[in-house]
Amino acid sequence: MCHQQLVISWFSLVFLASPLMAIWELKKDVYVVELDWYPDAPGEMVVLTCDTPEEDGITWTLDQSGEVLGSGKTLTIQVKEFGDAGQYTCHKGGEALSHSLLLPHKKEDGIWSTDILKDQKEPKNETFLRCEAKNYSGRITCWWLSTISTDLTFSIISSRGSSNPQGVTCGAATLSAERVRGDNKEYEYSVECQEDSACPAAEERLPIEVMVDAIHKLKYENYTSSFFIRDIIKPDPPKNLQLKPLKNSRQVEVSWEYPDTWSTPHSYFSLTFCIQVQGKSKREKKDRIFTDKTSATVICRKNASFSVQAQDRYYSSSWNEWTSVPCS
């Protein structure tokens, strides 16, 4: 992820005395300090500059502690670990003049830390963000998992392409589900994003990038996912599933309809369907049939059930969940 390098002037609050960009502004008054994490690591030297034209009578404190760390318009600190992070504030005469929150971002053996989010391991290892789209309208849902529920914040940025990014607008992340896994709780967070100038019928040439900034207490981490919408398509299940017995026959005619959320016209945005009849025992063999039509004739015995699911006809993305109806 690219971040704009700090521009230093008289009113700047943080200055990094290093030729490398090891500190950058996440948002107003919040800065990420990138740290190589190993024993006896030197850390990063940071110079704080108070946002005031005053020169004298200025003192510095860290977080809520009243302990004075230094005096003068600038304060030089060495950020080596989380104990050196936090909110630094400059004061004069009992009044807070300006402040800056420093957040370490750990790198061990050349790899950025991924302690805040849980690896979902689907469709592959080190999958922290997962995204899906119900159609080609440019609306996307992304989600991630964590075992953390307190002192946790997220911010999301998304675009199509990185060299000349096109707009994708994301809402705020919300807690969407809570599960118990053995002795642990697992929290699912999600966000809705919309491509600003989506063209459903256009060929995708650049992937969509989704970037999540995660902060737990004073720890910062960054997670990214890159994809084409065609790769994350997962239609809603077919609707209005019906069975019609045929006279003098063991067979029934089953029919269904495209989901309301699927892109139109269906002659262009087509689905293919997988159908099956499942006996009362789940161990019974299931015969699956693939069809591009929205009806079929099958043998549907008593106590069995008929199921159907859908997938984009022209691109091998995800199948949706089965929707079922009893045979009798």
UniProtKB/Swiss-Prot annotation:
Keywords, ordered alphabetically: Cytokine, Disulfide bond, Glycoprotein, Immunoglobulin domain, Secreted, Signal
Pfam name, any one: IL12p40_C
Fibronectin type-III domain location: 237-328
Protein name in UniProt: Interleukin-12 subunit beta
InterPro entries attached to this UniProt entry: FN3_dom, FN3_sf, Hematopoietin_rcpt_L_F3_CS, Ig-like_dom, Ig-like_dom_sf, Ig-like_fold, Ig_sub2, IL-12
Disulfide bonds: C50-C90
Gene3D superfamilies to which the protein is assigned, alphabetical: Immunoglobulins
Signal peptide: 1-22
Molecular function GO labels: cytokine activity; cytokine receptor activity
Database matches in SMART domains: IGc2 (SM00408)
Domain Ig-like C2-type intervals: 29-106
Species of the source: Cercocebus atys (Sooty mangabey)
Family: Belongs to the IL-12B family.
